[in-house]
């Protein structure tokens, strides 16, 4: 099974000049979804926690955590979780965004795998690393379903954490 066959290119979405990688067909096929989760999970076996960000990261992170029987921790947009949270603001090409992590969910010095759907420029992943450093967790590795290699080169060249992907474009 070729997982790339289940990722659809959508031209000019969400705006002209963009080629959007639609993972909906991959998620809608039980065998393709099962395979990508198992492939991603191979890289997460040695971590104490699986951490993923709103929203599509949750799809992969929760499934991997369930598959490996490990705790799953959500990184969310502001004001979506109760209680004290670590917060990080980061820049996007069209503005900025904020991510939060509840303070009491990850034990100090625990090892963590960060999981996401697609790696483009790495802004979200950098913010997640910063949040986990605030929580005094050890980022063991990063695992993404899809790596857009032309867009991710700068991020990967400055990254000190191992990064693995299942599908590369």
From Swiss-Prot:
GO biological process: adenine salvage; AMP salvage; purine ribonucleoside salvage
GO cellular component, one term: cytoplasm
EC number, UniProt record: 2.4.2.7
SUPFAM superfamilies per record: PRTase-like
Catalysis: reaction(s): AMP + diphosphate = 5-phospho-alpha-D-ribose 1-diphosphate + adenine
Pathway: Purine metabolism; AMP biosynthesis via salvage pathway; AMP from adenine: step 1/1
Biological role stated in the UniProt entry: Catalyzes a salvage reaction resulting in the formation of AMP, that is energically less costly than de novo synthesis.
Keywords assigned: Cytoplasm, Glycosyltransferase, Purine salvage, Transferase
Example GO molecular function: adenine phosphoribosyltransferase activity
Record organism: Mycoplasmopsis synoviae (strain 53)
Pfam families noted in UniProt: Pribosyltran
Biological classification of the source: Bacteria, Bacillati, Mycoplasmatota, Mycoplasmoidales, Metamycoplasmataceae
Gene3D superfamilies on file: 3.40.50.2020
Official protein name in the record: Adenine phosphoribosyltransferase
Compartments reported by the entry: Cytoplasm
InterPro entries reported for this sequence: Ade_phspho_trans, PRibTrfase_dom, PRTase-like, UPRTase/APRTase
The keyword Cell inner membrane belongs to this UniProt entry's keyword annotation: no
Family per similarity comment: Belongs to the purine/pyrimidine phosphoribosyltransferase family.
Assembly behavior: Homodimer.
């Amino acid at each position: 099974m070729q997982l790339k066959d289940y990722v659809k290119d959508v031209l000019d979405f969400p705006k002209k000049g963009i080629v959007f990688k639609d993972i909906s067909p991959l998620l809608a096929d039980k065998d393709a979804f099962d395979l990508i989760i198992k492939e991603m999970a191979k890289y997460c076996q040695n971590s104490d926690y699986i951490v993923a960000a709103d929203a599509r990261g949750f799809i992969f992170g929760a499934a991997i955590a369930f598959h490996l029987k490990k705790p799953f921790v959500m990184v969310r947009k502001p004001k979506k979780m109760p209680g004290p949270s670590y917060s990080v603001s980061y820049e996007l090409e069209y503005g900025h965004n904020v991510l939060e992590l509840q303070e009491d969910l990850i034990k100090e010095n625990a090892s963590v795998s960060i999981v996401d759907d697609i790696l483009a420029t790495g802004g979200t992943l950098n913010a997640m690393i910063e949040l986990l450093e605030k929580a005094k967790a050890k980022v063991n590795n990063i695992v993404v379903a899809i790596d857009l290699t032309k867009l991710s080169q700068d991020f990967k060249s400055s990254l000190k954490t191992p990064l693995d992907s299942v599908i590369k474009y």
